[in-house]
Amino acid sequence: MSMDTTILVEIGGLLRAARKGLDLTQEQVAEMAGISRPRYREIESGKSAARTSTLINIARALGLELMFIPQPMVPAVNALLQPHGSDDDLPAFVASSNGDDDA
């Protein structure tokens, strides 16, 4: 499997996990993203690359934001996103798992 194919499959897997986590069908995501279901299926399966604008629309349909992070910053961003010992240790921008609003 080529590096490009591996990346497409990885992106598709992330999209699939996000979609299933929201209990959405491929049809629903495709409609919200403004593409056909067959096109969405190809992207989610990693069989086809997508334009950046299409990925942005899909991500937003799934409540995600596509971001480009400078490579030297990736370790720091990954560290921020790693779970810690308790909810008190979560960065301020991560939703608490208990659903309480302190504001």
Predicted features by range, described:
Residues 1-10:
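A detector for short, charged/polar N-terminal pre-domain segments
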Residues 69-103:
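Short, charged recognition helix plus adjacent turn
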Residues 38, 49, 78-79:
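Short Asp/Glu-rich motifs
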Residues 20, 34, 45-47:
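Residue-level detection of the helix-turn-helix DNA-binding "recognition helix"
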Residues 46-60, 67:
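Short, basic-rich loop-to-helix N-cap that marks the start of a DNA-contacting helix
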Residues 13, 40-43, 50:
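Helix-turn-helix-like N-terminal two-helix hairpins of bacterial/phage DNA-binding regulators
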Residues 13-28, 57:
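Short basic helix-loop element that most often maps to the first helix and adjoining turn
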Residues 24-41:
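Short alpha-helical DNA-recognition segment
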